[in-house]
């Protein structure tokens, strides 16, 4: 199973990495399930499916809920190569006995989304530009404070490691990822998901941050006034994503107290 851009870390694969994965999968006849539901939110618009290099053995899973900003509208898709029709038929049989079908309103919305349009392309380009700038800003604040974290490359997640503060956190009686998230929520009002939820060791001081607590409509409208060839000005994120930045800065303040 591949998941990229990834949840919970916002990272992705390079073309060379995908080619190597494809080479190994082909050599050992491995079926790849490539979860690419965040592919449209690759921050540079450069998402490449591993199916390009291993089409005969790759199943692509995707959907509308992420790139459409429609979290409650659950319409997922699986794309199978012809060589795996037998597996597609088996999955369809199980699905028909599990949830029967997608609700009609979601199907009508899905038709419009999958048809595509220039308006959708403009929305995606604008969303990527904002998420990229905001992700880099959040990354820089945490990294400058000494938190171990990768700069996100897609989606809207980061997976920071607070172990450089383990001694200080132990003095606060914060000994695992659950305690870390509970204390930050109680004391600073910042909600994160503990690393334990992603099968990380409980004592590991990791957590997922989802940096989307901002006014999407307002930021998208403001972004559309800036020409496509220009980067967002330095004050754009501060002006339109202030709640997210306040949350990240609250984490740093809490670590330094």
Functional labels for PLM-detected ranges:
Residues 169-174, 183-192, 198-257:
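PLP-dependent enzyme catalytic core of the Aspartate aminotransferase-like
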Residues 27-28, 145, 188:
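Helix C-cap/helix->beta junction micro-motif
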């Amino acid at each position: 199973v591949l998941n990229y851009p990834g949840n919970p870390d916002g990272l992705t694969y390079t073309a060379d990495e995908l080619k190597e994965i494809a080479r190994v999968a082909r050599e050992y006849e491995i079926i790849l399930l490539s979860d690419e539901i965040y592919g449209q939110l690759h921050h540079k618009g450069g998402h490449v499916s591993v199916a390009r290099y291993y089409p005969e053995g790759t199943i692509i899973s995707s959907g509308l809920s992420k790139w459409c900003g429609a979290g409650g509208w659950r319409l997922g898709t699986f794309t199978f190569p012809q060589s795996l029709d037998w597996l597609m038929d088996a999955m369809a049989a199980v699905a028909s006995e599990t949830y029967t079908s997608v609700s009609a309103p979601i199907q009508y919305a899905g038709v419009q989304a999958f048809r595509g349009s220039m308006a959708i392309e403009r929305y995606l380009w604008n969303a990527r530009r904002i998420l990229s700038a905001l992700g880099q800003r959040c990354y820089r604040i945490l990294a400058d404070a000494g938190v171990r974290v990768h700069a996100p490359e897609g989606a809207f997640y980061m997976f920071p490691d607070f172990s450089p503060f383990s001694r200080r956190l132990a003095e606060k009686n914060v000994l695992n990822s659950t305690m870390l998230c509970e204390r930050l929520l109680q004391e600073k009002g910042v909600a994160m998901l503990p690393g334990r939820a992603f099968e990380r060791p409980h004592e590991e001081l990791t957590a997922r941050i989802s940096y989307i607590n901002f006014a999407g409509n307002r930021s998208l409208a403001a972004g559309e006034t800036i020409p496509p060839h220009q980067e967002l000005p330095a004050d754009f994120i501060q002006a339109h994503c202030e709640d997210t930045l306040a949350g990240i800065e609250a984490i740093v303040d809490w670590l330094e107290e």
